Amino acid sequence: MTEEKDEYGTIVVARVAMEENMFNPQPDIPRIRNDSTHSYQQPESMLEKLNTYYTLAVVIAQLTIGVLGNSLTLVADATRIFADHLELFQYDRAATPGKRLTEIITVGITNVILFLLFVAFLLTASGRAATMEFDINRLYLSIGTAMAMTANTLQTLCHFRTWQRERSYHSSLYTGSKRNQLMHGFVYHFIAYFVLVSSLLIIVNKDYLIADVITTYATSLLILANISSIGYQLYHEYFSLEHPQDEYEPI
């Protein structure tokens, strides 16, 4: 009888201890994930999704029209539009390290391809400038220029919409301050407009074929600006992946 009471008392004490641990856990356990290094990512709006689809459509159309019309400016500007859109890519910092690394590698490979295209545009434009033995279909050039100007306007609006959000990291480059962001918006896209308008000289008079070479050089420099910005973003994303802060905190 005494043994049964002792056993019953042990069970009661153990149950009370479990309840105390349940409602007053030790500071070491349990531990929950603290996403201090993974900033909240706002979901992509319908406008941004439509802009993405439209941008891809314009890039494909411009590449096709540029090749058919033999306009190096249209081909280079299609690449610039894609590079500028890629610069706005929102990395998912709430994803697993494996998925984040996949994003970084994919964007990095794309950035390398863009750099190779940048070099190809410079070499091709230099070859055209040396011989001037090329012709451009003015009808294709007119259609492609109109599409490019529309896409440039939408990208300007998307840039300003993105800059209103708080970035997941603080950079010291031009993307780091609102002032320099606005400078990028006005200067970059103003130059893009100027390049496209300059290409209209060819439509007026074919004697201005040299404008296709000059605008290709200018567009290539804009592509290089995008490549540099994307590379800087990749550096910060990879650094945050390799050197995370304390991701856990006690309840």
From Swiss-Prot:
Localization terms from the record: Membrane
Keyword entries, A-Z: Membrane, Transmembrane, Transmembrane helix
Ranges annotated as spanning the membrane: 56-76, 104-124, 184-204, 208-228
Annotated membrane topology: Multi-pass membrane protein
Keyword Cell membrane among record annotations: no
Protein's name in the database: Uncharacterized protein F19C6.5
Keyword Membrane: yes
One GO CC term, this protein: membrane
